[in-house]
């Protein structure tokens, strides 16, 4: 099974560069604006798009992403509407991989089998479910693989060599290395430490390793991209979105461009990385 994610990383390897991976909350600040932003991301340079599924108890998310989830939920975003948004995105974009990121509870309530069928039909390529450990692979990870979806696992600075094989056992698509301990958006990533961590993970897997948490600028994105297979940026894009909203938290004429312009600057940082390393 070759997925869009596999194809994208193969293309990037030929180009000699790392991936620029964006994260935004689905439905933030409202479903229509969210779709317009996501449609603008490939042109801005996003190689892979992660879309958050809003949830009422997002334990791994920092304040910015939690606020994004609240805005999305208040605007009526649901799992069904998130999948519909991806379906609408796919009408005009067939090659950029889309990864859904979230928590198990909304998927469980929706129904695992139905969710996987509907996600695949909508054009989803992979899942990141932050609160399902490898010991629970039979719940969602293995069914997702059977449905043709990549299941992307998180590794952290505290994931030691003893634990890594279990974390990586059924992982596919790529490994998402969380470069700092704590919640999203809480600190800056240390690119030197990241390089050592990526090398350690690669001793256990042939999968690409993307690095997220703490990347806010083009320079930081370049530093991470030089030491990994991809730089994931979320909180900085969410902050750009929230900074463009009006006093009521509603979208303005600036909202789509605020996110797309920052994405383009970050993408340029990532794309300059391999040239600098050569």
UniProtKB/Swiss-Prot annotation:
InterPro entries for the chain: Aldolase_TIM (IPR013785), RibuloseP-bd_barrel (IPR011060), Trp_synthase_alpha_AS (IPR018204), Trp_synthase_suA (IPR002028)
A Gene Ontology molecular function term of the record: tryptophan synthase activity
Catalytic activity: (1S,2R)-1-C-(indol-3-yl)glycerol 3-phosphate + L-serine = D-glyceraldehyde 3-phosphate + L-tryptophan + H2O
Pathway: Amino-acid biosynthesis; L-tryptophan biosynthesis; L-tryptophan from chorismate: step 5/5
EC number in record: 4.2.1.20
GO cellular component: cytosol
Pfam families, per the entry: Trp_syntA
Keywords: Amino-acid biosynthesis, Aromatic amino acid biosynthesis, Lyase, Tryptophan biosynthesis
Active site: 50, 61
Role noted for this protein: The alpha subunit is responsible for the aldol cleavage of indoleglycerol phosphate to indole and glyceraldehyde 3-phosphate.
Complexes and interactors: Tetramer of two alpha and two beta chains.
NCBIfam families, per database record: trpA (TIGR00262)
PANTHER family (alphabetical): TRYPTOPHAN SYNTHASE ALPHA CHAIN, CHLOROPLASTIC, TRYPTOPHAN SYNTHASE, ALPHA CHAIN
Family according to the record: Belongs to the TrpA family.
Protein's UniProt name: Tryptophan synthase alpha chain
Organism field: Nitrobacter hamburgensis (strain DSM 10229 / NCIMB 13809 / X14)
Originating gene: trpA
């Amino acid at each position: 099974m070759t997925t869009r994610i596999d194809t994208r990383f193969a293309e990037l390897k030929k180009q000699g560069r790392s991936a620029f991976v964006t994260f935004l909350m689905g439905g933030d600040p409202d479903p229509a604006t969210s779709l317009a932003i996501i449609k603008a991301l490939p042109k801005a340079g996003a190689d892979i798009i992660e879309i958050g599924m809003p949830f009422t108890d997002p334990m791994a998310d920092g304040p910015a992403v939690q606020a994004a989830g609240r805005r999305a939920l208040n605007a009526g975003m649901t799992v069904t509407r998130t999948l519909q948004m991806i379906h609408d995105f796919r009408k005009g974009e067939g090659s950029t991989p889309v990864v859904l990121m979230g928590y198990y509870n909304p998927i469980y309530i929706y129904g695992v089998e139905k969710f996987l069928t509907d996600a695949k039909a909508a054009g989803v390529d992979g899942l990141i479910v932050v609160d399902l450990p490898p010991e629970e692979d039979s719940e969602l990870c293995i069914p997702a693989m059977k449905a043709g979806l990549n299941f992307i696992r998180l590794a952290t600075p505290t994931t030691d060599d003893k634990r890594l094989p279990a974390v990586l056992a059924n992982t596919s698509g790529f490994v998402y290395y969380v470069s700092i301990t704590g919640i999203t958006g809480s600190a800056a990533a240390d690119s030197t430490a990241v390089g050592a961590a990526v090398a350690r993970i690669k001793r256990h897997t042939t999968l690409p390793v993307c690095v997220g948490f703490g990347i806010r600028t083009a320079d930081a994105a370049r530093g991470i991209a030089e030491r990994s297979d991809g730089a994931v940026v979320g909180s900085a894009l969410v902050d750009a979105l929230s900074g463009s909203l009006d006093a009521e938290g509603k979208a303005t004429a600036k909202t789509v461009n605020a996110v797309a312009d920052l994405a383009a600057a970050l993408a340029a940082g990532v794309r300059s990385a391999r040239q600098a390393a050569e």
